Every structure is written in C-alpha cells, then in structure tokens.
C-alpha cells in the first residue's frame, strides 16, 4: 500500500512541483511487510478484535459513538476481499482507531518500537526530522538529525519524498489512537517516524521540502535518513533522559518527569529525593512539575514520589468506576464477564513526616501529550487542591480509562487492546472535557522552552 501526490491543495501542488526538480532518483522504498494473510485470516482477526472489545470493555458507549462504530466496522470488514501483508492489514484495521476515542484502545503493529530499532541496527533509516504541530495547525520541524543541513527547527514541513504534508497527515491521523483529535495530533507528531515508515517505507535518503520559519521561498534538501529514534519511539529510554531537575530564575524549582513507568520506579525515587531536598533547602519560591511529555504509567509512582513530597492532604484520583470482571480481578462471588459500577470513597494519605517535603506552591505543567496516569495525577491535584494545573485544556479527557487488556489476534499477530475500567474524576464533573488549567499558559509544542519561560514569568509576577 503506497501513497502519492493526489490531493490538490495549493500546498501539495507546490510540494509536488518542487520535488519534481531534476535530481537523481531516490531508491525504491523498502517495507517491513510481515507475513501474508489470507482473506479468511483477516476476517477472523478483525471479528476477533471487535468481539474482544465488546467482551472486555465495560461500556464502549462511554467514549464511542456506537452508530459510527458500527458503520465504520462494517465498512472496514466489507473491504477485506483478498489477502494482505500484516503491514497492510494494520493500515486497514487501524482506520477504526480514531473512532474509539481512547488511546488505551486500538490496534498497532506488534512491538513497533523494537521493530524500528532492529531496522536501524540492520542498516535502515527513518525520516531525519522530528515534527510538532504549531498553534496555527501547521506541521513544523522540531529536531533535525545530525548532518542534515538546510533544515532548521521551526521550519514548516511541506513534503517528504513528494508526499505533501496534508496527504501524510490525513493518512496518519486516520489511523491514530486518542481521546480527541488534539491528542491524536500529539500522538502522530511523536510517532511520525513510525507512521511514515509503515505508510511510505524507507528510501535511505529523503527529499525534504520546507518553508523557513522566517519567511522565504520553500527549499528542497536531500538528506540521509536518521539512524537513531526519537524519544517516544525508543524501546528503552534511560532515566537520565526521562527525569531532570534544576532551579529556574527567581528561585523556582523545576522537576521534569516524562513517565511513570514501573521499571523506572527506583530511578524516579532517587531523582525526586534529591530534587525535593534541594528545593526545600533552597526555600524555593515555587515548584513546577513538568509532565508535558508524560503519557502515563503506574499511579503509585506519582503518589509516592511526587505527591508525598509536597502535601499531607488526603486525596484520590477517582470518585466512581465501571469495571468489567475478569479472572484477573474477580473477587469471590463475582461473575466473570459481568460489569460492576461503584462509587469510590477511599483516600490516600501521605505520611505525616517526610524529611524532604516541600511546603510552597506547586504548579503542574501539562500538555497535549499528557495522558493516562498523568491525567489521574492532574485531577487528584486539582480536585483536592494539592497543586495548580498550568497550560491549556488537556487533549486527553479528564475522566480516564485503565487496566488495559490485550486482545489476542492469532492469525495476524497484530497488537490490539482495550481498557476494562472507566473512571470518573473526583469532582464527578467534566468527563467530556480535558483538564482545564487553573493557570492558563499558551502551549508551544514547537519551542517548549517558551511555555516554561512564560509560566516561570507568571509565577514571579505573583510575588
């Protein structure tokens, strides 16, 4: 399944014309197609995916427009008329992903991070830029691979190998998971190299057309592909990459936490012990906890390694839940497959004594990629007045889902999943919206330092 310049917006016509300038022809793209699947196998796995969601999800209608779900499921299934490679099957099945309105639900290539990593280790390449969406909706260069000249952060991306930006985004966003279109954009931006590889393949070298950020004619650059993966696509990120802290101008403490991964528990505990001890010793004016790049993980990490260090107030991250009973969570007397709905009135109480506890004002800076356990952290902090939330309305819904279960698809080996629990935030309100900020600060995804500087400036103006 390949794509070419077929959409005729002015931007894409410009891109196609520029790329048509005389240059040596690029190599044919190479793909990791995987095994070929028969029509019967494709239908069996698609039906298995749909049946698995119905059997495990406690209530699809909490997120999903069921009429759209039924229509799109039928359309995708009806188009399974012949054999496909596993890559093509994913591209086809994944058209249902956006309609699930939940980044905990959907279908992916199995272990795509590992597959990309192996591709690079065996001499392959990925696109030599990372991208982010600007506030005007344009796709901008975020970082550039070493050795690439003529392309700079902030440049507007026009095309890659003749594929116009509008065309690429239409193909990628129509297969992206996520609660909202804003989250889907954040998801695609951070996995742009993965989407590009599965849609358009690897050509080793890439023809990039960009418009400089400071306004001049579009320019075309041929560059060798990158040989390292963006942070969000690395199979195993280091603790040094995920966590950092420092003191900002004006004696404001800053702690960046890019994940609540269970395997980083000890590393996070070590960093936060050191950071909070420094913030306390410095008598910092305020503390910023930056979770803009944190897509979640395990709740105990933010509870024990963050909240315990800045409050003694009891709190919770939910007030109600709906859960599907499975053999893994059943209590004696529960019926497997039944759905239970219950209020939640338990509270987590931080220890009364914490040698490194910080007692000043705390601001949690969120962004469009903040998700899952990070949203749970935000709503607990906001609804129990533990800290103030800064930024814009989150792209993820304030009432999250969780306890994600895998749906076995034995024919294709594709990776499908769905959550078995849906939470209501502590306030019981606002489930159809993101988390609304207490301190509105414009989010600049292209130049993230500007957002942090703006919050730092706002805090200093308050005292």
What are these regions (language model features)?
Residues 1-2, 116:
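Compositionally biased, intrinsically disordered low-complexity regions used as flexible
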Residues 2, 22-24:
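Position-driven detector of the extreme protein N-terminus
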Residues 3-14:
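Bacterial N-terminal signal peptides that target proteins for export
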Residues 6, 17-18, 432:
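Secreted/luminal cysteine- and crosslink-motif detector
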Residues 12-22:
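Bacterial N-terminal signal peptides
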Residues 26-287, 291-304, 308-322, 398, ...:
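Flexible, low-complexity junctional segments that flank or bridge functional domains
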Residues 299-451, 457-458:
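Conserved acidic, small-residue-rich alpha-beta core segments centered on
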